[in-house]
């Protein structure tokens, strides 16, 4: 393998990592904004713009990166609305904070994950088919 080819592969890897990090950052921003649209913050108008960064992020990259981005959105938005849940679980069961966080990740993934992941896959499919050739 030539030095030029190795450099091109390294640059492509760096672009992929940067793209994934930007997508995850967009998912976190969307999750926070979407979570603030619900009580206790009650900023309902944010729900209309909260999904824009997420929708832009899942259009680019691979399907696995889009699904990871959607999962991060699910967990972050669930945590913004239910930050009390991990502590309540750990206090109720007499376990440490790690048990509460593990229960939170499991429940937020099981409750919100399938719908968000299915929507993400369908949205990517429609967006790719609607692209002009």
Label each PLM-derived region with a short phrase.
Residues 2-133:
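Membrane-embedded alpha-helical bundles of multi-pass enzymes
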């Amino acid at each position: 393998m030539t030095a030029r080819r190795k450099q091109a592969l390294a640059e492509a890897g760096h672009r992929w990592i940067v793209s994934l990090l930007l997508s995850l950052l967009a998912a976190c921003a969307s999750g926070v904004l979407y979570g603030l649209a619900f009580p206790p913050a009650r900023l309902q108008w944010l729900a209309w713009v909260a999904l824009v960064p997420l929708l832009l992020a899942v259009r680019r990259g691979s399907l696995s990166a889009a699904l990871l981005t959607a999962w991060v959105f699910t967990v972050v938005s669930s945590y913004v609305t239910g930050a009390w849940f991990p502590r309540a679980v750990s206090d109720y069961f007499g376990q440490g904070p790690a048990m509460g966080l593990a229960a939170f990740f499991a429940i937020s993934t099981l409750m919100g994950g399938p719908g968000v992941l299915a929507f993400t896959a369908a949205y990517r499919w429609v967006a790719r088919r609607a692209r002009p050739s």
